[in-house]
Each structure stands twice: as structure tokens, then as C-alpha cells.
């Protein structure tokens, strides 16, 4: 069995301290990358939070009641789709 001297141990630790940061830079970011779907979900969550903080004007749609409230973006989109469908059906 080979015994390491003090100089061998210090040289190994010095080499390890020089290589370890580059190894961390190479391997750690790839393990922490989020999938694209989670980024989209995060962006949607931010958008919904922004939309919920905006006070809305009443909807100009004859078949739907006018709504004054803080609503989410999804609610707005469904109301707009319903309004467009009703408008197309009338013509």
C-alpha cells in the first residue's frame, strides 16, 4: 500500500481546489434547469397576478352582466370568447 506524504496530499488538495469550481460550473446548471412547461406556467402565473391587480371596465356584451371586479386573465378570455360567439350568432 502506498502512503501519501504531506506534499502529495497538499498537491492533491491544490489540484482538487482548482478543478472543483470548473466541475461545478459544468455539471450543476444542467441539473437545475427547469423544463419549458414550468417556465410557461411561471409566466402564466405572473400574468394572472398582474391581471388580477387591474380594475376592469364593464364588459360591453348584451347577454352578459357588466362586471366590476378584479378578475383573472382566464376569466377575461372566456368572457371575450362568449361575447364574440354571441355577436356572430346575432348577425
Curated annotation (Swiss-Prot):
Q: Name one GO molecular function term.
A: enzyme inhibitor activity
Q: Which residues lie on this side of the membrane: Periplasmic?
A: 1-8
One cellular-component annotation, GO: membrane
**Database matches in Pfam families:** Microvir_lysis (PF04517)
Q: What is the effect of changing residue 18 to A?
A: Loss of ability to insert in the host membrane
Topology relative to the membrane: Single-pass type I membrane protein
Q: Mind listing the GO biological process terms from this record?
A: symbiont-mediated suppression of host peptidoglycan biosynthetic process; viral release from host cell by cytolysis; viral release via suppression of host peptidoglycan biosynthetic process
The consequence of residue 19 to A is:
Delayed lysis onset
Where in the cell? Host cell membrane
Subunit info here reads: Oligomerizes. Interacts (via N-terminal) with host SlyD; this interaction protects E from proteolysis and stabilizes the YES complex. Interacts (via transmembrane region) with host MraY; this interaction inhibits MraY by blocking lipid access to the active site. Part of the YES complex composed of 2 host Mray molecules, 2 lysis protein E molecules and 2 host SlyD molecules.
What role is this protein assigned? Induces host cell lysis. Inhibits the host translocase MraY activity that catalyzes the synthesis of lipid I, a necessary step for the host cell wall biosynthesis.
Member of which family? Belongs to the microvirus E protein family.
Please state what the protein is called.
Lysis protein E
Species whose genome carries this gene:
Enterobacteria phage phiX174 (Isolate Sanger)
- The gene behind this protein is E
